[in-house]
Amino acid sequence: MVQLFHLTFTQGFFIGQLSVIVIVYIFLRFFLFCTKEELKNVQEESYPLSPSNEKSTTEFNDATHKVTPSLSEIYDVKTHEEESLDWFNVLVAQALSQIRQDAVSDDAALKKLQTLFNGKRKPSFLGPIHIKSISLGQRYPVFSNCRIQAQPDDTNGLRATMDLSLEDDIHFVVNTSAVLNVPRPAFAMLPVSLSVRIVHIRGKLSIYFSQSSKSAKRAYLNFTFDPDFDMGIEIQSLVGSRSKLQDIPKIAHIIETRIRKWFITRCVSPQFQQISIPNIWPSSAREGHRQKSTE
């Protein structure tokens, strides 16, 4: 009797998602990022053209070019309606859930943040910084109203612009000390406890591709926020050992300004963040073909 192999619902679900991701990636890599020069080189290496079939190949390329639909026939950026992105929200929620589990399992986020705070840029008037607790939140961002628009600085490029809303409680608690270095180093220390919370982030997010070139062989997925973003930050402070001062406005203002400046200089237009897209296009060296010598 032949026993058939049956997948569970969970296994089938993840295999299906993986298949979709692979298909989308292959489509982006080979159809969007394959330049005419790369395509021509591959055709020349795989199928060298002889004088007898050059004419037929040219006619075939011309015919193919005529029947290839333009982008406006597939997606008209001027008339297409905004998309809800419900499917995208589900994928982002699954990825974010896994990131949170990994960060909690081995305290990766806590260790990374503590190393960052105690780096070379730490002011001399602050003692060692200890992260008492950290939370990456429990809710998920909601993306909506996606629109495909032309790049403002590139006539051929497109970008996806969408609304982002995150209502959550992302926070960390820090214990440190204010150090008085006069009249001598570490003359006196004042304990300081801080609680920093990010309660909401709202704004417009733009995502676009940077195509690879000869100088930069990798392609990148870029994302940036519009300058009119809204970030809700709550700061609580406790200063002193015996007589404690609570929620000093000046401390809250300094920390909030630092956080906003850090975000603006990295993630707000014209600044952007990049995610490198792996190059899976096989090179002639990896395939074992003979490299052509340049004369």
From Swiss-Prot:
Residues exposed to the Cytoplasmic side: 34-295
Subunit (UniProt): Homodimer. Component of the ER-mitochondria encounter structure (ERMES) or MDM complex, composed of mmm1, mdm10, mdm12 and mdm34. A mmm1 homodimer associates with one molecule of mdm12 on each side in a pairwise head-to-tail manner, and the SMP-LTD domains of mmm1 and mdm12 generate a continuous hydrophobic tunnel for phospholipid trafficking.
GO biological process: aminophospholipid transport; mitochondrial genome maintenance; mitochondrial outer membrane translocase complex assembly; mitochondrion-endoplasmic reticulum membrane tethering; protein insertion into mitochondrial outer membrane
Stretches of the chain found on the membrane's Lumenal side: 1-12
GO cellular component, one term: endoplasmic reticulum
Pfam families: MMM1
Matches recorded under InterPro entries: Mmm1, MMM1_dom, SMP_LBD
Annotated family: Belongs to the MMM1 family.
Predominant place of localization: endoplasmic reticulum
Chain ranges passing through the membrane: 13-33
Primary role: Component of the ERMES/MDM complex, which serves as a molecular tether to connect the endoplasmic reticulum (ER) and mitochondria. Components of this complex are involved in the control of mitochondrial shape and protein biogenesis, and function in nonvesicular lipid trafficking between the ER and mitochondria. The mdm12-mmm1 subcomplex functions in the major beta-barrel assembly pathway that is responsible for biogenesis of all outer membrane beta-barrel proteins, and acts in a late step after the SAM complex.
Domains (record comment): The SMP-LTD domain is a barrel-like domain that can bind various types of glycerophospholipids in its interior and mediate their transfer between two adjacent bilayers.
HAMAP family assigned to the protein according to its UniProt record, in alphabetical order: Mmm1 (MF_03103)
Organism of origin: Schizosaccharomyces japonicus (strain yFS275 / FY16936) (Fission yeast)
One GO molecular-function entry: lipid transfer activity
Residue stretches making up the SMP-LTD domain: 81-278
Stated name of the protein: Maintenance of mitochondrial morphology protein 1
Keyword annotations from UniProtKB, A to Z: Endoplasmic reticulum, Lipid transport, Lipid-binding, Membrane, Transmembrane, Transmembrane helix, Transport
Membrane-topology descriptor: Single-pass type I membrane protein
Location of the protein in the cell: Endoplasmic reticulum membrane
